[in-house]
Amino acid sequence: MVALFVVATIIVFLVIDYFVQRAAKRKAALAPAAHVSAKPRFVIPKGYFFGKGHTWVELLPDGLTRVGVDDFVQKIIGPVSAVELLPANTVVQKGDRLFTLRQGGKEVSFRAPISGKVVGINDDLVHSPGVVRKEPYKEGWVLLIEPTNLAADIKQLSIGNEAALWLREEIKRFRNFITAQTEVPAASGSALPAGVTLMDGGAPVNDVMEHSPQEIWQRFETDFLTAGNGKKSANS
């Protein structure tokens, strides 16, 4: 009798454990992922679309889109001292200059990932530009755009795993780019300072461009922020 009681008790616990585990697995399957990451240090939030010029687009319920700069760029350029924004009601075409981040006397400009009209700006960035660095996907958003050709433009953006794969390739490309800059003859005045290195695994260290001259910032803009946006020159 005792043996039967023990066996019955074990069976009861096994059944309870089965349903607990099943419920936990179901909950995990239904819970939304916080983000996908190309590397642990570079975040790609779920549901955000990414342009080739390292801007992101978030579709809002009211039909507007929120635009900002991705985690990759804000980490490698370092602290932001000022943000230059287009005024509200400005009409932009995909690939037009949209906003500029400054660090002292250096700057890089970002292109519009979609066409539309600027209907709002993040005023907080005027007084606290560092928010772009702290919260690039939330409080650090840059502009609100009312899209005019979203159906076509969105096809040229990436999302989720596709965006993560693209960013991995961008990290590799940046590694080659920054390595080439360290090999520029010092006499040219545009080489990276001694001691700037990359972490193992191909990912750049934070702030790797902070102490580089404007010439390298300009090359970075041309190679990474302008390419793929329909503009031939970073100055257009």
Language model features by range: what are they?
Residues M1-S236:
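Contiguous, well-folded functional domains in the mature portion of proteins
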